Amino acid sequence: MIFALLSWLAQAGAQESFNPLETNGMVRIVVAHGDHLLNAFLPDQARVEAVFNRGLTGFTRQNSVTGAWLSLLSTNDIVGIKVFSEPGPVAGTRVAVVAAIVHGLMAAGLPPDRIIIWDRHLADLQVAGFGSLGQVLGVRVAGAEEAGYDTNTFYLPDSPVTGQLIWGDLEFGRTNKDFNLGKKSFVSKLVSRQMTKIISVTPLMNENAAGVCGHFYSLALGSVDNTRRFEGNPDRLAVALPEIDALPVLGDRVVLHVTDALLAQYEGGPAGYLQFSTVRNELWFGHDPVALDVMALKELMLQRRLLNVPLMPANFAIYTNAVLLQLGIADPARIGIEKTP
């Protein structure tokens, strides 16, 4: 499987444009493409929403947007829309994509007070424009750190690395002799106590240690504290990201993964750099975060080759470990990609 994955990713350099492997595999990824979704790198809300709805109905095989959403969740759920807002409004998860989700959920009968747009830091959400969106639509916008962390729900790896605790971490400032002090990453109360379903929406953006700021990177590091011990270290990320996402309070609640591929940023992430970005005008839909993140790695490698930019290491071990935990499929022969008409 790993040889097949490496070969598939390597083929990106030989292609003139992104043409994912078309198969009848066990995993479906739906790609929705539109024309002129961006104007001077800013999304056209109406066009983005139309393409999003086309992709959603195609992925769920439903005849209506309402039917699509109700096939994934119920109006009694509390839905958390996990965004990646750190890069800002242009390069991070885009407000227009999330607005399309909120409009669809509300039209399907979900009350606005049962919708939460969230990320790790409230300040990042505000800068990225989600605070304003929340005010306009009447939905909550919340930071995982500001909500506090749950002492009863945590990640403790088999071979823990003691973290350098900082302000905001649950155990910061404690001076007791607890053997496990700094070895746990506690899940935010926002996740463990305030939502029943999660929709993950990530940009198509590189990250040097993880390869891509994808669904594993965004959900894992956005949901728990004491993450400095993993960040920037490819080996530690390869273990921690899949294991955190495998926590039932996280992985079992995700009903949809959406990759915001309106732009592809192949260098500089997680900061936003338009000079390292190309327009893709696409949204990708799937249940499998492994397949989507592997697909993102391939696309970013392709962009670097097309632009004669030196290739960056891709952290394949994340997805090897994720497959071992049965979180998804990385074998390209088992990833079927459908393009909406």
Positions of PLM-derived features:
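Bacterial Sec-dependent signal peptides at the C-terminal "C-region" and cleavage site
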Residues: 8-16
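Bacterial N-terminal signal peptides
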Residues: 1-8
